[in-house]
Amino acid sequence: MESFAYVLILTFAIATLFFAIAFRDPPKIGK
């Protein structure tokens, strides 16, 4: 259970950073 919570928080942190960069600069990946 502890490892699952850790992975969930880590994924949320990475997603937050990804969206922050994606919305700050024009998308360079994809279309």
UniProtKB/Swiss-Prot annotation:
Q: Origin, by domain of life?
A: Bacteria
One of its GO biological process terms is: photosynthesis
Please report the record's description of how this protein sits within the membrane. Answer: Single-pass membrane protein
Query: Which subcellular locations apply to this protein?
Result: Cellular thylakoid membrane
| Entry-linked InterPro entries | PSII_PsbT (IPR001743), PSII_PsbT_sf (IPR037268)
Keywords of this protein's UniProt record, alphabetized?
A: Membrane, Photosynthesis, Photosystem II, Thylakoid, Transmembrane, Transmembrane helix
GO CC annotations on file: photosystem II reaction center; plasma membrane-derived thylakoid membrane
A Pfam match is PsbT
Entry's transmembrane regions: 3-23
Relate the protein's function as given in its record: Found at the monomer-monomer interface of the photosystem II (PS II) dimer, plays a role in assembly and dimerization of PSII. PSII is a light-driven water plastoquinone oxidoreductase, using light energy to abstract electrons from H(2)O, generating a proton gradient subsequently used for ATP formation.
Family per similarity comment: Belongs to the PsbT family.
Q: What is this protein called?
A: Photosystem II reaction center protein T
Q: Which gene encodes it?
A: psbT
